[in-house]
Design a protein with these regions (language model features):
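Conserved core of the PLP fold type I
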Residues: 145-289, 300-318, 389, 471, ...
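Short, conserved active-site loop motifs that form the nucleotide-linked donor/cofactor pocket
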Residues: 188, 291, 321, 409, ...
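N-terminal basic, amphipathic alpha-helical segments
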Residues: 1-146, 351, 355-362, 370-373, ...
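Short glycine/serine/threonine/alanine-rich loop segments
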Residues: 49, 66, 231, 257, ...
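Active-site PLP attachment segment
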Residues: 301, 308, 314-349, 364
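Short, solvent-exposed loop/turn elements at beta->coil junctions and helix N-caps
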Residues: 327, 448-452
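Hydrophobic residues in well-ordered beta-strands that form the structural core
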Residues: 214, 235, 293-295, 369, ...
């Protein structure tokens, strides 16, 4: 039944009130195309008005194209144009594309594409940044859930503090101590994944027109957040020891940045680990010029060889480092729990943003993760994950090596992390390669997606080895090589993508 409330003391005529009420319901979609309106006699009786008042109201709606008379059905909501459900003929729908912020429009959609590619039948994807779902300790978490106390079971249905579930903050503080970072639970905040920390840092420190310094090639998710904020990103060249800190100080003098963003350990996409000497030099420059450092460390515990290097936060002499990390890369992607360790004023400001954004992280996930850490399950799980990923890394490297002389690709074997950063000959026909890879049902991420300053490195591709099933790695490498050979046979020698094109193939 359609309910209409009339204001009989209003100066607006009753027929206009009736017409307006129906018009609002049709425009909002509450009344859909083909919905029958009450008969004139029934509506007049229900509203206590003359039938002529309803006749006049329906006449207004018909004249405006909102309703029409149909034989055998009476007055119904008019047919609509397109798929605009509730928008009658003659009424123009909003032109949404013209209303979007230009900054939001510049944001890429690589993550959605990655999810789509991974779901395509028969595709072997090296494009993702995902962990291996088969390594999730499902039985452990099921047992932890069964063994929750009555108090914990009740707490799952309650909100947690904005800064995070107190016991979990304490557990994270202990975990940070194992990484050499001195941070009390008050210095820790739980996040909905570490990428939320990137967003909060941008909203806290940056304004349109500001400058961020980062590695020349870096995490595309961070680049999208910075660029959507109207910020200019300046890339610092890298070598095998990480960011070229000999160029950093001059860049700080020249650009007066508001933030330095870095992934110093098993960097995404290069897999490079910044040397200890470079870390001290970076911190020294940041301290001298008063520039905060945002350290992103999602892969630091995934070491398969080499000697450990302390996080920047563990070496920080002046408290200028904001440290981000996550459990998503070592557990599973759907477990969107990350954390930040930072000085109290930063935690306070992030907490305000968290309260405005999503109040707090999912309470059941926080409780279960805390029990997982306190129960001593984290270290053995890490050992299992490291062993599996080391094996996958080596298998991919060996598979690619079989085609090295034929294709001319090359890479450095990283000591940890998720990725091989593979170079191709400078003359390589990259556009043809992307097309042939798609035809051969194999996926990767191309170098331009990671370019900080918009200067594409067209002869690079990033290959993820953690998510692809180990049994598919050999075949995936064969498909890549086949696509590369076909590209050289049929390619035009072009090395540049079209403007703005950053395909996943």
């Amino acid at each position: 039944m359609i309910r209409l409330d009339l204001e009989r003391e209003s100066t607006t005529p009753l027929f206009e009130q009736i017409a307006s009420a129906f018009r609002e319901r049709i425009m909002s979609g509450l009344l859909h195309e083909g919905t029958a309106l009450p008969t004139e006699r029934d509506l007049a009786k229900r509203l206590g008005v003359n039938r002529s008042t309803v006749v006049r109201a329906y006449g207004e709606l018909k004249a405006d194209g909102f309703v029409e008379a149909r034989v055998g059905r009476g007055t119904v909501v008019a047919a609509v144009e397109g798929e605009g459900g509730g928008i009658p003929r003659g009424v123009e729908p909003l032109e949404w594309d013209s209303l979007f912020s230009p900054d939001a429009g510049s944001c890429g959609d690589l993550f959605s594409e990655m999810m789509s590619v991974n779901g395509r039948e028969g595709v072997i994807s090296f494009a993702s940044g995902f962990p291996d779902p088969d390594l999730f300790p499902a039985e452990v978490f099921s047992g932890l859930e069964r063994d929750l106390s009555a108090a914990d079971r009740r707490a799952q249905f309650l909100p947690s503090p904005v800064e995070g579930f107190g016991p979990l903050r304490e557990s994270v503080s202990e975990l940070l101590s194992d990484r050499g970072i001195d941070a009390s639970s008050r210095d820790v905040m739980i996040l909905s994944g570490s990428q939320q920390g990137l967003d909060f840092a941008a909203r806290t420190f940056l304004s349109p027109g500001d400058i961020v310094l980062t590695e020349k090639s870096t995490f595309f998710g961070a680049l999208e957040i910075f660029r959507t904020s109207g910020v200019r990103v300046v890339g610092i060249p890298m070598d095998r020891d990480g960011m070229r800190t000999d160029l950093l100080e001059s860049a700080i003098r020249r650009h007066n940045p508001r933030l330095i963003y870095t992934l110093p350990t098993f960097q995404n996409p290069t897999g490079i680990t910044m040397s200890l000497e470079r870390r001290h030099e970076l911190l020294g420059a940041a301290s001298r010029f008063g520039v905060p450092v945002l350290e992103d460390d999602p892969y630091g515990e995934l070491r398969y060889g080499g000697s450990p290097v302390p996080p920047l936060k563990a070496l920080d002499p002046c408290g200028c480092v904001i440290y981000l990390s996550s459990f998503s890369k070592v557990l599973f992607l759907g477990f969107r729990v990350g954390f930040v360790a930072a000085p109290a004023p930063v935690i306070e400001r992030f907490s305000r943003l968290k309260q405005m954004t999503d109040l707090h992280v999912n309470t059941p996930a926080q409780i279960l993760l805390d029990r997982f850490l306190r129960g001593g399950h984290y270290a053995p799980h890490l050992d299992r994950v490291r062993a599996a990923y080391r094996r996958k890394r080596d298998r991919l490297s060996e598979a690619l090596s079989r085609y090295r002389s034929r294709i001319g690709w090359d890479w450095d074997l990283p000591d940890g992390g998720y990725y091989l950063w593979c170079s191709l000959p400078g003359f390589f026909p990259m556009r043809a390669f992307t097309a042939k890879s798609s035809e051969n049902r194999v996926a990767f991420l191309p170098g331009p997606a990671f370019c900080a300053d918009g200067t594409p490195r067209q002869n690079r591709i990033r290959l993820n080895f953690t998510h692809v099933p180990e049994t598919d790695i050999e075949e995936g490498a064969r498909r890549l090589a086949r696509a590369a050979e076909k590209a050289r046979e049929n390619g035009s020698g072009e090395t540049a993508f079209a403007d703005g094109q950053e395909p996943i193939v």
